[in-house]
Amino acid sequence: NKKRTGRVVSEYGMQAMPNYSTIKKVTNPEDRHLFSDVLKVHQKAGNGFMKLNSYLNRYFIDSTKVEKMNVKDYTYLTQCMQYYSLKNIIGIHRSKAPYNMGTLVWQLNDCWPVASWSVTDYYNRQPKAAWYAMREAYRDDIVPAIDLTRPIDLPLENPNISWKIKGNEITLKATKAAKYVYIEIEGYTGKLTDNYMDLEAGKEMKISFEGKLNKPVITVMSLYDVLNRYK
């Protein structure tokens, strides 16, 4: 709530699916559909998927379209949802200083591969989308921005994202503004300098990764790409 907040707010968060690479490790291909028995085993929150779907309906996509989604796109959207939530909650809390002088997110990491409030994945502690949101929102040198428009209400256009790789650096460029741009590198277990970021139209953004990769298989997608599949 933008008008009401506590002096110190602790143990709050938003669920999201684990990274899709993790889902592939703990499922067989026939289990990768919403909401398979195996996926339900990896969701321990009471009415967890129902709650996630209600949040997606409010902020990202009509609930009638959620049922048509594949698991990979659903995973992406829930992570965008977690990013959006923590970015704005932390931003609102910090904007209330000095009345609010403390905000503690639940949770950092997982003890098993599962849909949860964690902002890092069980395997290799790889960041989920919200990890990047938290890193930015907790910076001391900025006043964190607060989104005034819900993603579901954004006038998204096809960003036609292009990318090129040189050494351990990926350069991205979009013809139209792009939201929640996600870079996936197949088999990569390290960290990127940024992910799930926004791109301004016509401006290049450089993202680095750890180590060296031999002929990496890279996929880049944005919120427009996912939502456009379910029009």
Segments (PLM) and residue ranges:
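Short acidic, flexible loop segments centered on an aromatic residue
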Residues: 174-191
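Conserved active-site loop/cleft motifs that coordinate metal ions or position small ligands
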Residues: 101-107, 182, 219-221
